[in-house]
Amino acid sequence: MAVWTKNVHKLIPSFGIRFSQRSSVDEIDVQRLNRLADVWWNEDGEMRLLHSMNKLRIKFIVNGLVNTGRITQKDYNKPEPLEGMKLLDVGCGGGILAEPLARLGANTTGLDAGKDLIDVAKVHAAKDPALAARLCYMHNTIEEHADHNKETYDAVVASEVIEHVADKKIFVDRCVATLKDAIRMPM
């Protein structure tokens, strides 16, 4: 993960990857991940690595938001340090990262191209009624979402996602398009 400015798209070389002008979605990878939907929330199963990394990822994101001035050190020590922030979790899968971000006070939108994963995320989130007002899951691509949500979010998180993206330039450009002006992005 890194913290990037709105000009991040200028920093990513192509590495010989052919960029599609239409979508960043790797359909084969989406299908593969969708097949894991039933085990997504099993902390001892195939997703155990994501679960085990979560505390570290959350701390990294919150620290990144402090370091970029989005939240203060005073906010950092509150039970809900992200209160009032609008976050987009792109490639949220079954919601392993989106749920704790919402519990920390952020109004969180989880976005994924995998319908089965979004369905699992919604079912799991419904077990905690406190999340209902702060967490929304959407089955969509970043391209579609960005077209209707320009300069909407305080931060965009794309954790453990870039390696699953077919067109990295389009992906990052569309993520950045959803950010409010002069905001940085933990990714």
Roles of regions detected by a PLM:
Residues R32, L36-W40, F60, G64, ...:
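Solvent-exposed, charged/polar functional surfaces in cytosolic regulatory/catalytic domains
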Residues S52-E83:
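Conserved alpha-helix/loop element of class I SAM-dependent methyltransferases that forms part
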Residues A2-M47, H51, K55:
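N-terminal, positively charged/glycine-rich alpha-helical extensions of SAM-dependent methyltransferases
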Residues Q73-M187:
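Conserved SAM-binding loop
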Residues A37-W40, D44, L65, G69, ...:
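A general structural signal marking secondary-structure boundaries and capping sites
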Residues D29-R35, R70, G93-G94, D147:
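Short hydrophobic/aromatic-rich motifs at helix boundaries and adjacent loops
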